[in-house]
Amino acid sequence: GATTANSGYPRSELREMTAGGSQNASWSNTAGSHSMTIRQAITHVPDVKPHVVAGQIHDGSDDVVMIRLEGTRLFVEGSSNDLGELDPNYALGTPFTVQVIAQDGHIYVNYNGVPKVTYARAGSGFYFKAGCYTQSNPSRGDAPGAYGEVIVYGLHVSHT
């Protein structure tokens, strides 16, 4: 799959845009409320390093929070730290809904309607990403044809 400038891992993601898709979105969680709700299922992971990211808040330089699957453990990661578990025994192909809310200098993550993570992290230049960011490649021991797959059934982004 395709990689981007700052990563050696392949991805197929939607990036939040504005102005009918002609401008990159960029907002601060210290003003207003910003929400992304995704109904999705992770359906495939690489064999050797079975890691996939299925949703993110990103800023101008790096990820802020990621919805991440490692093996069967679905959790939230932020600044390379484990922020909280969503499902310790996620089964591939199981649909779930994750809501990421950024407001008042915090990021909140709900999983299937249940609050799971509160993360104190204020910032700007934020934007949402949804899709599949596979966290492996041949240098990690996976075959060149290894892949991750995420099916997005529904996606809603709002700003108030």
Question: How should these model regions be labeled?
Answer:
Residues T72-F75, I107-Y108:
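Hydrophobic residues embedded in beta-strands of well-ordered beta-sheets
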Residues N110-V114:
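Short strand-turn-strand beta-turns centered on an Asx-Gly dipeptide
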Residues F75-T97:
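Short, aromatic/His-centered strand-loop micro-motif at the edge of beta-sheets
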Residues I38, T94-Q103, I107-V109:
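Short tryptophan-centered beta-strand motifs in secreted/extracellular beta-sheet-rich domains
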Residues A31-S35, D47-K49, G55, A120-T160:
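Ligand-recognition surfaces built from glycine- and aromatic
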Residues G1-R73:
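Secretory/extracellular carbohydrate-interaction modules
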